[in-house]
Amino acid sequence: MSEGDLFLISFLKVGFASLGLNEQLINNIKRYGITKLTPFQMEVIKEIKENSNVIVDSIEGTGRTISLIIGTLDKIDETKQQQEQEQQERQQTDQQFSFPQILMILPTKELSQTTKVIYSSLGGGENNNNDFKVLSCIGGVKISMDIEILKKGNTQILLGTPGRISDLFSRKRFDTDNIKILVFDELDEILSRGFECQLEDIIKPLNNNNNLQIIVSTSGINELTSNFINTFIKIPKIIKSQQEPYKF
């Protein structure tokens, strides 16, 4: 299939089997109303599942965020055995922590909240009851409220704006060792808003984890995004789409 191909694949007939998604996620996707994926979206999900560092370069409206959410959700460790063991060890002290597996940085409060809703809808268990917690941390909300939720220890997907996530990093309010996927959604927009220092504060300590997978979405690669990618992301797979915005 050529890059930017506009024809659609029937997700219900082909995509589930070819992508190897877990059954509960498939059921949630159906319930959410997604019936088709483009070849571009399928390629994004495939590369995420294969643990590649991925740069998704496409205009808005091509379904890239849905692709990121589906791909990362499929990699959640649902057994949570390691998380629960570590949490029990932490509970022997005065501090309690969450052990998020996915950390996603977004440019705006609105996008963070919208993405949280989609993660919650696609990540729910039977009858759409979440077996894990999705937390959106944004400015304008008291940070003490975020900290109280993180102390409960069940946050597996952490979303937020750069300033708030950087603040939580500096306060050491969640365990970073369990993070296996770091996502920068709309990196070009994040950098254009002047958050480069905050992104560095977030990514530098995580880069010590050799198993960390980094995923970026961007609408074009300019000097700012190119410098960031070259500095912090090892051997990324670039997936580029030139197709027109697609509506489900």
From Swiss-Prot:
Q: Where are the transmembrane segments?
A: none
User: Biological process GO annotation list?
Assistant: negative regulation of translation; P-body assembly; stress granule assembly
Where can the motif Q motif be found? 14-42
Signal peptide extent: none
- GO cellular component terms listed in the entry, alphabetical order: cytoplasmic stress granule; P-body
| Helicase ATP-binding domain location | 45-239
Q: Motif DEAD box — list its residue ranges.
A: 185-188
Q: Which molecular function term from Gene Ontology is one that the record holds?
A: hydrolase activity
Binding residues annotated for ATP, in chain numbering: S58, I59, E60, G61, T62, G63, R64, T65
Keywords (A to Z) from UniProt: ATP-binding, Helicase, Hydrolase, Nucleotide-binding
Q: Which PANTHER family match?
A: DEAD-BOX ATP-DEPENDENT RNA HELICASE 50
Please identify the protein, giving its name as recorded: Putative eukaryotic initiation factor 4A-like protein
Q: Give the organism the record lists.
A: Dictyostelium discoideum (Social amoeba)
